Amino acid sequence: MVAASFETVAIGAHQSEDRGARDVKWRGGPMIEHMPVLFAAGLGQLPETLASGIVNGCIYALAAISLLVVYNVTGVINFAVGDFLMAGAMLTLLFAGPNGDPHRLPLALAVVLAVLIVTVVGALLEVLVIHPRRRYGTIFLLILTIGISSLLEGGALIPTGSLTYGLRPFTNGPAVSIAGVLLPRQDFWIVGSTLIVMGLLWYGATRTRTGKALRACEVNPTAARLVGIRVDRYWTIAFALGALLAAFAGAILVPVTYATYNMGIPITLKAFVAWILGGVESPVGAVAGGVGFGVLEAVVLGYSPASVANYGDAVPLLLLIVVLVVRRRGLTRRLVVTRV
């Protein structure tokens, strides 16, 4: 039944008029609809390239913040973040269906329900899988998150197969022209949502008891326990919040690309690079790193020959090597010494 539902989504998505004449092949990362092959087009397409990079970067930024939240509270690098994003995208597709299917849920409700389900799954995985094995150390837990990633990927493969799926934009209508640059309406949802999430995180961290308790667990877990904070509970909250952020990123991403069961690992890698670029403890840095990486990726792939662009997934690896070479002392000390 579920597989049949996804088949309907796939057929409808490829026939959608709202998605225009686009035929973007998923290559392991968000490929925004207005990113053409720019090698022959020259600098005339630079504004569109930068716009694509910023939109891509916002998705990477949300995933990077997810990594940051989990790491700051627990010391665990969650390599399942991309698959939480994939789950959010796939569940949104399943619940909403393409082109306003009257037999499916309204789009807004589909997004909320998908994000809530992934959030609960994230919390349950922490309680049932991560938490009982904390004493084995952070390296073991990191490897465990890779196993969770494989589990989520396999779980998505069973009902969806290896097909790609698409969703209509949140707001229908032609692209908006700003200073001569055509911007699809979904881009405004992505950028605006990222800014709103940043504002909500700042408010939550500085104005709510839960946020302050999370920060206390981050700064000094022992002292937090002494003042009555249940650190174990906030491990669960951190994983749930990380899953929520990733799932929301997947839900707002899927209208501008095609989703597939194996989209998670490349996004995890890119989010990890963005997180490292921005500093492992700074939410603002994670956003800056995500947007910066997105722009760099767009420029490199956009102005490269097709033979080079086909190896686009190597960009984050090369950038990570450069960052670790240039700032090797600061980054490694921060990642290792802080959590001993």
Provide a role label for each language-model segment.
Residues 101-148, 155, 288-293, 297, ...:
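Alpha-helical transmembrane segments within multi-pass membrane transporters and channels
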Residues 2, 7, 14-17, 23-63, ...:
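Membrane-interfacial amphipathic/re-entrant helices at transmembrane-helix boundaries
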Residues 182-260, 283-289:
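Helix-loop-helix "hairpin" substructures at the membrane interface of multi-pass membrane proteins
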Residues 35, 132-133, 138-207, 231-237, ...:
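Transmembrane helix-bundle core of multi-pass membrane transporters
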Residues 9, 25-35, 45, 159, ...:
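Cytosolic-side transmembrane-helix boundaries in multi-pass membrane proteins
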Residues 43-59, 183, 204-209, 236-275, ...:
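Inter-helical junctions in multi-pass inner-membrane proteins, predominant
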Residues 51, 73-124, 303-304:
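Membrane-embedded helix boundary and interhelical linker motif in transport proteins
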Residues 82-87, 126, 133-157, 264-276, ...:
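Pore- or pathway-lining transmembrane helices of multi-pass membrane proteins that form conduits
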